[in-house]
C-alpha cells in the first residue's frame, strides 16, 4: 500500500464531494473544483471521508495511488482555505501593478510586461514590490507564480529580478580588477 494513498481524507463541514463518471467535484465556501480521476484508481465518498483505492499492484496503479490521493486532498484544502504564493521584486525601477484582469510589470525592459491573469487567480500587490498570488487551485497558483517569476528570474550578482519570498539567492562575487 502507498503510505500516502491509504490515508483517508476528512471532508470538512460546508464542503460537498460528488463522484460521477470518473469526475470528482468538490464544492466549498471558496468555490468549486473538478478533476477527472485516472482509471487506475477508484474513489469512494462515505461517512464524511474520501478514500482512494487501487484494484491491483500494477506499476501504473501504484504510481497513481498516492498522486490521486494528494490531488484530491489539495482540492479539499483549496475550496476551504485556498492557496497563496508570495513573490518579491528586487531591482531599481522594478515594480508591479494590477490593472483589471492584467498584471503589469516594469522589469527593466524597454517595454512593460503585461500578463493576463487566468480565471480563478487573483494577485495582490503590496508596495509595488511584493506580490501575493491567490486561488483555490494549487496547481494553477504555482504555475502562475512560476510564469510571473520567469519574466525576470533573479540573477546571482546583484539579486535583481523576481523571486519567491521563501527563496534564497546564492550570490556570486563579481570580477576582480587587474592588479
Swiss-Prot record:
Family listed: Belongs to the universal ribosomal protein uL6 family.
NCBIfam families hit by this protein: L6_bact
Lineage of the organism: Bacteria, Pseudomonadati, Thermodesulfobacteriota, Desulfuromonadia, Geobacterales
Annotated HAMAP family: Ribosomal_uL6_B
Self-association state and partner proteins as the record states: Part of the 50S ribosomal subunit.
Alphabetized InterPro entries for the sequence: Ribosomal_uL6-like, Ribosomal_uL6-like_a/b-dom_sf, Ribosomal_uL6_a/b-dom, Ribosomal_uL6_bac-type, Ribosomal_uL6_CS
Function: This protein binds to the 23S rRNA, and is important in its secondary structure. It is located near the subunit interface in the base of the L7/L12 stalk, and near the tRNA binding site of the peptidyltransferase center.
Protein name: Large ribosomal subunit protein uL6
Annotated source species: Trichlorobacter lovleyi (strain ATCC BAA-1151 / DSM 17278 / SZ) (Geobacter lovleyi)
An example Gene Ontology biological process: cytoplasmic translation
Recorded GO MF terms: rRNA binding; structural constituent of ribosome
Gene (UniProt): rplF
Keywords, alphabetical: Ribonucleoprotein, Ribosomal protein, RNA-binding, rRNA-binding
A GO cellular component annotation in the UniProt record: cytosolic large ribosomal subunit
Gene3D superfamilies with a match to the protein in the record: Ribosomal protein L6, alpha-beta domain (3.90.930.12)
Amino acid at each position: 500500500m502507498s503510505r500516502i494513498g491509504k490515508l483517508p481524507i476528512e471532508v470538512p463541514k460546508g464542503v460537498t464531494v460528488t463522484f460521477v463518471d470518473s469526475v470528482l467535484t468538490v464544492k466549498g465556501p471558496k468555490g468549486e473544483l473538478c478533476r477527472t480521476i485516472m482509471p487506475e484508481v477508484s474513489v469512494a465518498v462515505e461517512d464524511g471521508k474520501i478514500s482512494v483505492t487501487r484494484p491491483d499492484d500494477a506499476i501504473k496503479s501504484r504510481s497513481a495511488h498516492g498522486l490521486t490521493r494528494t490531488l484530491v486532498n489539495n482540492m479539499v484544502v483549496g475550496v476551504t482555505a485556498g492557496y497563496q504564493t508570495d513573490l518579491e521584486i528586487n531591482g531599481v525601477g522594478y515594480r508591479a501593478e494590477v490593472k483589471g484582469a492584467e498584471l503589469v510589470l516594469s522589469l527593466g525592459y524597454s517595454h512593460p510586461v503585461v500578463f493576463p491573469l487566468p480565471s480563478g487567480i487573483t494577485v495582490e500587490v503590496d508596495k509595488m514590490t511584493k506580490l501575493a498570488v491567490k486561488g483555490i487551485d494549487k496547481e494553477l497558483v504555482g504555475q502562475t507564480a512560476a510564469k510571473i517569476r520567469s519574466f525576470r528570474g533573479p540573477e546571482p550578482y546583484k539579486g535583481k529580478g523576481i523571486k519567491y519570498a521563501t527563496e534564497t539567492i546564492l550570490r556570486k562575487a563579481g570580477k576582480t580588477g587587474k592588479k
